[in-house]
């Protein structure tokens, strides 16, 4: 590649995300890191570059802050929508804390709880919420089910800050627990509850416990299948985004170790907000900050010598809107060369 000529060390990995664009088998790409390091800008820019080499790209935000709309200057929701100015790039914003009742209703109108008035109001929700993480797990499973039915060639996830990023790895276990609890409930009280539910109009959407069990099993199968794909380096990779500061580097190392323990491929780090002051720059603060950044950059290069480490400059203006995102995205595939 042309940018390889810019690398003085022949053995150094290319400091770009070009390898991700070249890997045509990739289906899932996660972009994650500490809050405020430029995850959304990076994921939007990566999706833009992917749209140049792939037939169809879907960008999904699972961050409750939902910055995709702000980044593109266009409102997105829980349904995939084409990004203005593109024919093969769509985006959607999902709430990972979507309610269990909405899922059970399968998109239908909210109905009065059939168990209300029997001293059992909200019982199904209480049961579900008693399992840690099940709400997010089912919401995520539902989204994956939607995504599977759509024909996107590659899906980019703009994830929530680090602490929540890796929850999807626990979803199969969470859903197994939920299924076991519901199975136990169904076997013990199924006939009685179905009888009560029948007299009260059933669960939302006219479902009974058997329908609920079937839905849970279907979601579990979907999650299990996708989880297998997540652990296949030919199909899935994780792009870490950070800044050259101690806390961000610490979070990145913790995240990479956790990804490795789960068998998730990661081989790229984007370091944002780097300063490149000129040698005769009189700004003491700029030079001091650059000195600090240089120290952590050296640590990153030493720790992750087998990673593609992309160095991105701190810009004088916000990266918002299609044109600025496209300009920023070019630096993900062509190494930034600071002015002399």
Swiss-Prot record:
Q: Specify the species.
A: Talaromyces marneffei (strain ATCC 18224 / CBS 334.59 / QM 7333) (Penicillium marneffei)
Molecular function (GO) terms for this protein are:
ATP binding; ATP hydrolysis activity; metal ion binding
Give GO cellular component annotations, separated by semicolons. GET complex
UniProt-listed CDD domains: ArsA (cd02035)
Please name the Gene3D superfamilies in this protein's record.
Answer: P-loop containing nucleotide triphosphate hydrolases (3.40.50.300)
Q: Which residues bind ATP?
A: 34-41, 245, 272
The record's family statement is: Belongs to the arsA ATPase family.
Name of this chain's protein: ATPase get3
Identify the keywords attached in UniProt to this record, alphabetized: ATP-binding, Cytoplasm, Endoplasmic reticulum, Hydrolase, Metal-binding, Nucleotide-binding, Transport, Zinc
What EC number is given for this enzyme?
3.6.-.-
Primary location: cytoplasm
Q: How does it assemble?
A: Homodimer.
What the entry lists under Pfam families is as follows:
ArsA_ATPase
User: What's the superkingdom here?
Assistant: Eukaryota
């Amino acid at each position: 590649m042309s940018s390889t000529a810019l690398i003085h060390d022949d053995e150094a990995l290319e400091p770009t995300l070009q390898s991700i664009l070249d890997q045509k088998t990739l289906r899932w790409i996660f972009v994650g890191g500490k809050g405020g390091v430029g995850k959304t800008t990076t994921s939007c820019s990566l999706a833009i570059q992917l749209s140049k080499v792939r037939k169809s790209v879907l960008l999904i935000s699972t961050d409750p802050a939902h910055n995709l709309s702000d980044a593109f200057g266009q409102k997105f929701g829980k349904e995939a929508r084409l990004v203005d100015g593109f024919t093969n790039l769509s985006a959607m914003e999902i709430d990972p804390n979507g309610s269990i009742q909405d899922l059970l209703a399968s998109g239908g109108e909210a109905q009065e709880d059939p168990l209300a008035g029997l001293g059992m109001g909200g019982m199904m929700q209480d049961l579900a919420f008693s399992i840690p993480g099940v709400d997010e797990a089912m919401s995520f499973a539902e989204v994956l089910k939607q995504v599977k039915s759509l024909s996107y060639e590659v899906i980019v996830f703009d994830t929530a800050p680090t602490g929540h990023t890796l929850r999807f790895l626990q979803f199969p276990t969470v859903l197994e627990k939920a299924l076991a609890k519901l199975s136990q409930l169904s076997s013990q009280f199924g006939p009685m509850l179905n009888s009560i539910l029948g007299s009260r109009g059933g669960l939302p959407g006219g479902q009974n416990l058997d329908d609920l069990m079937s839905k849970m099993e279907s979601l579990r199968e979907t999650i299990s299948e996708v989880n297998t794909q997540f652990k296949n380096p030919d199909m899935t990779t994780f792009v870490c985004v950070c800044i050259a500061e101690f806390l961000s580097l610490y979070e990145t190392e913790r995240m990479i170790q956790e990804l490795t323990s789960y068998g998730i491929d990661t081989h790229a780090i984007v370091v944002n907000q780097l300063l490149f002051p000129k040698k005769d720059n009189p700004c003491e603060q700029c030079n001091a900050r650059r000195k600090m950044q240089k120290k952590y950059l050296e640590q990153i290069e030493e720790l992750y010598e087998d990673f593609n480490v992309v160095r991105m400059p701190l810009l004088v203006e916000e990266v918002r809107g299609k044109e600025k995102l496209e300009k920023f995205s070019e630096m993900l595939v062509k190494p930034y060369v600071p002015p002399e």
